[in-house]
Curated annotation (Swiss-Prot):
The active site is at K32 (proton acceptor), Y257 (proton acceptor). The keyword Isomerase applies. It holds the Pfam family Ala_racemase_N. One of its GO terms (biological process) is D-alanine biosynthetic process. This is Alanine racemase. It is an enzyme of class 5 (isomerase). Substrate binds at R128, M305. One of its GO terms (cellular component) is cytosol. It catalyses: L-alanine = D-alanine. Keywords: Isomerase, Pyridoxal phosphate. CDD domains: PLPDE_III_AR (cd00430). Belongs to the alanine racemase family.
Length: 365
């Protein structure tokens, strides 16, 4: 059995630290991609009293949130019409991505005789989604004056927040400042938000009315220097499995597909029942590390869909079937932390955690 053990205390402590750091700004907690792989329902259930909003990528994720909490939920992505009626009935916040979408929302709202809560996404330089910057004020004005929309928020997204010295950050901030000025001229109550985790840590003065700290809430820090208080944030999860078999190699034998790992006679290998079919990175095969009984062991051979093997050498520490295996550590400096795994596989912690799928059990402790 493969289990992602999540510390409720660490999760809640991370959010409390962030709330202290952002002052009076609201907190919108992103739980998209199954709460970055940690499990939407469990994460929402254990944090809803600490945050103001939740944010997700699509309608189906939003419904999973509203099933367990009453907080407002913002959908970042495009809304599919087969779900829009249920979204409106549950007061799920819709993102407006272009001017023309306002009229479509109004038509549906009239049919349901219910107003739609909306946030307008402005493209200030990410060039992915959102209303074009040059069309922003017209779109905001149109939505604000609509009889069928409640314009609750206006937001944008930083393209280069992970590089705090990138000139695009200033360009986007200046553009958003002009949008905020226009928006607040209509109503001081409209929530303006720009920053994700890297945004409000790397750029001073851009918390605005609300921040959206995703990866930081789950315990992953940017590499650049941040405030000492933020340094108290810790990863919330450990990925664990069990040794299911011990194999002793004979002379000249290898292990796994293509037998790329060739051991020595008498070498012992531990078989672990987790593989890329569980969302664990295949690239770790033959170069990653796991922790068994506080000893690090190297992976041996290619990772398969459902399993991997690690070399125990001569098994001087007497690893046995049934021993617990730590695949992802909650200690960032460890060789099997999400941070270290991301470095080894040339990706980011978001990727390592969010691709862990539902073959892995989530357990709040």
């Amino acid at each position: 059995m493969n289990i992602l053990k999540i510390s409720k205390q660490t999760l809640r402590n991370n959010i409390k630290i962030i709330r202290e750091y952002i002052g009076n700004a609201k907190m919108c907690f992103p739980v998209k991609a199954n709460a970055y792989g940690h499990g939407i329902e469990d994460i929402v259930e254990n944090t809803h009293d600490l945050v103001d909003f939740f944010a997700v990528a699509n309608s189906l994720e939003a419904f999973r949130v509203t099933a367990v909490a009453k907080n407002p939920v913002l959908v970042f992505g495009v809304i599919y019409y087969e779900y829009i009626e249920k979204m409106i009935s549950e007061n799920i916040r819709v993102s407006i991505q272009d001017y023309e979408y306002i009229e479509k929302l109004e038509q549906i709202a009239k049919e349901l005789d219910k107003k739609v809560y909306a946030h307008i996404n402005i493209n200030t330089g990410m060039n992915r989604m959102g209303v074009d910057y040059n069309d922003a004020c017209r779109t905001i004005q149109r939505a604000y004056e609509s009889d069928w929309l409640i314009l609750e928020g206006v937001y944008s997204h930083l393209a280069c927040a992970d590089n705090r010295d990138h000139p695009t950050n200033i360009k986007q901030k200046n553009r958003f400042d002009s949008i905020v000025k226009f928006t607040k001229g209509l109503s001081q109550d409209i929530i303006c938000h720009l920053s994700n985790s890297y945004g409000f840590l790397g750029q001073k003065g851009i918390c605005y009315d609300m921040v959206r700290p995703g990866i930081l809430s789950y315990g992953f820090l940017p590499e650049f220097y941040v405030d000492r208080v933020i340094r108290e944030i810790k990863p919330i999860a450990r990925l664990l499995s069990k040794v299911v078999k011990i194999i002793t190699l004979q002379e000249g034998e290898g292990v796994g597909y293509s037998l790329i790992y060739r051991g020595f006679e008498g070498e012992q290998l531990a078989v672990i029942p987790i593989g890329y079919g569980d969302g664990f990175p295949r690239e770790l095969g033959d170069r990653g590390f796991v922790n068994i009984n506080d000893v690090m062991y190297p992976m041996a051979g290619r990772m398969s869909m459902d399993g991997l093997t690690v070399s125990l050498g001569i098994n001087e520490y007497d690893v046995k079937v049934g021993d617990t295996v730590e695949l992802i550590s909650a200690i960032p400096r460890n060789r099997n932390s999400a941070f270290s795994i991301a470095k080894q596989t040339n990706t980011i912690e978001y990727d390592i955690m969010s691709t862990l799928n539902d073959r892995i059990i989530r357990k709040i402790i």
